[in-house]
C-alpha cells in the first residue's frame, strides 16, 4: 500500500530549512543542494517539490509572511484602533528569537528582491496590505491632522528602521518599544 505524503508539510519542511540557512548564512548560501543538506533529505526530493530555486524562495517568503500575519492577527485582541496598530507593529519588531530570525530573513529577501521582480512583487503586496490596515485603523481612531496613508507609511518605515537598529544591537528592546510608543 503506497504511503500517503503530505505535500504541503514537505514543502514547509524544505522552506523551513531554507529559512534557517537564510537567517544564519544569508540567501546567497541558499541552493537546492544546501537546502537538501539542511533538511536532511536528497537534492532529488527538493527538486520534486520545487522546480527552481526561485519557486522555493517565493514559497518560503510566502510562508514567513503567512506566519507573521497569523501571529499578528492572534495578538490583536483589542478593539481600540491605537492598540490594534501597536499590537501589529510590535509583532513585526524583532523582540524575540522567532521575530529576530524572521527579520533576518525578510532583510535578506529585500536585498534579493532588488534583482528578482517576483520577490519584489510579493514584498510590495505584503507592505501594501499592512499599510492599508494601518491607515484604516488610523481613520477609525479619528486621528486629527493626519493623512492616514502617509502616517501608515511612516509607521512602517519607523518599524523597519527600529528593526534594523535592534538586529544590529544599536538599540535595546525597551528603547525600540518606547520609540514606537512615542510615535503612536
What does each of the following model-derived ranges do?
Residues 62-68:
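Short, basic, alpha-helical segments at the C-terminal edge of helix-turn-helix-like DNA-binding modules
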Residues 13, 17-55, 59:
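Helix-turn-helix
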Residues 95, 108, 112-115, 155-174:
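Amphipathic C-terminal alpha-helical segment
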